Amino acid sequence: MSVKWEKTGKTTGELTFDISKDEIKLGLDQAFKRIKKNLRVPGFRKGHVSRVIFDQYYGEEALYEDALNIVLPNAYAAAVKEAGINAVGQPQIVPVSMDKDKDWTMKATVTVQPEVELGEYKGIEVPKQNTRVYQKDIDAELDKRREQSAELVLKKGKAENGDTVTIDYKGTIDGKEFDGGSAENYSLELGSGTFIPGFEDQLVGHEAGDDVDVVVTFPKDYGAKDLAGKEAHFATKIHEVKSKQLPELDDEFAKDVDDSVDTLDELKEKIKKDLKDQKEQVANDAIQEAAIEGAVKNATIDEIPDAMIQEDVDTQLNQYLGNMQRQGIDPQTYYKLTNTTEDQLRSQFAKNAAERVKTNLVLEAIVAAEDLKATKEEIDKEIKDLAAEYNMDEKVVRNTLSDDMLGHDITVRKAMDLITDNAKQVAKSKLEAKDSDDKESK
């Protein structure tokens, strides 16, 4: 294959390439097969015209357009690979020559990825993370579990925040009832914020048997627009008041909330370990985010083509809607439920698209600089993990995603890990002082 690449701009160029006679012949044969069943030639039954007769009657040139559409995608992809360029978006391709019994020559106007000049990406300074677990953290988790295991017991006297009341209520606006404004024997935890602001507060201090006229104003941004901003009266009857009875903090409690322990001390140790793991994960995520941000900031990229921005927005949109569909919500239903449109969703994803593209370009450049590779074992594991995550057959995943695509994701993660592992944690005060010095020097 004859291929010539000539840059015409920082992210544009012209790719001239040939399509061989053998490829063209295959394309012509396929094009003829597609139209044969509907062909009409005088003296022949419909669909029973040979290729020789077709060429005599219509001329081989009548198949050129269809044949080109058949062979062009593979020919263009091969030319891009041969030229060693990273093409993005859709090229504009025009024929230079399409002579009979000769190779065809095409010229494509192509957008390519911008060049990345890496700066420092090892030893990036990031804010020091504190992963220490304090006694107050353990106590807070124990309190949370006691709350979750609490029993509700009838209470005499006035209701307080944290108590649960059983109520009947009937709401009216301007003396008229409205949909969803009434209920009977409803259990409501005071202070939970379940009801609109002000409702729960007006029940505090009342007892079982009390009738309370609750007066509230629906928020201006309330979901039901016919109620938003309006004052409502709720005739409310309190039937019961219950308070939480927390379990004793002892070995029995420990065994009840976690069957893998036998004592309270064991529960505390397990909580400490779990909290430590959580803090270390949060810390690692923070270090990674800051380190990658630093590596991207240190890199130089000329300009990001619009085609890459649009590809990123398309990817984000398809992934988001795909997640919705896996939850049983099709795009049109989602737009209706959220009162949004596809254009609005695209605009939302477009806000950070340039930064996402720049980050990916820097990570890919690090993959190349460090010569990071994905092994067959890593690709096989990736397929297993994806199949388990999306509840799919491994063969389906393997047929859907190429080894190149999977390998790309694996090596990019390796680049992220490399940046993270080589990051240096320093005191936040030192970083702030350095940032201040950098700003003053500019």
From Swiss-Prot:
Enzyme class, first EC level, given as a word: isomerase
Pfam families registered for this protein in UniProt: FKBP_C, Trigger_C, Trigger_N
Reactions performed catalytically: [protein]-peptidylproline (omega=180) = [protein]-peptidylproline (omega=0)
Signal peptide: none
Main location: cytoplasm
Metal-binding among keywords: no
GO CC, alphabetical: cytoplasm
Membrane-spanning segments: none
PROSITE patterns: FKBP_PPIASE
Biological process, per Gene Ontology: 'de novo' cotranslational protein folding; cell division; chaperone-mediated protein folding; protein transport; protein unfolding
Cellular localization per UniProt: Cytoplasm
EC number in record: 5.2.1.8
MF-aspect GO terms: peptidyl-prolyl cis-trans isomerase activity; protein folding chaperone; ribosome binding
Statement: the UniProt record of this protein carries the keyword Isomerase: yes
UniProt entry keywords in alphabetical sequence: Cell cycle, Cell division, Chaperone, Cytoplasm, Isomerase, Rotamase
Domain PPIase FKBP-type: 162-247
Protein family membership: Belongs to the FKBP-type PPIase family. Tig subfamily.
Task of the protein: Involved in protein export. Acts as a chaperone by maintaining the newly synthesized protein in an open conformation. Functions as a peptidyl-prolyl cis-trans isomerase.
Domain notes per entry: Consists of 3 domains; the N-terminus binds the ribosome, the middle domain has PPIase activity, while the C-terminus has intrinsic chaperone activity on its own.
Official protein name in the record: Trigger factor
Gene behind the chain: tig
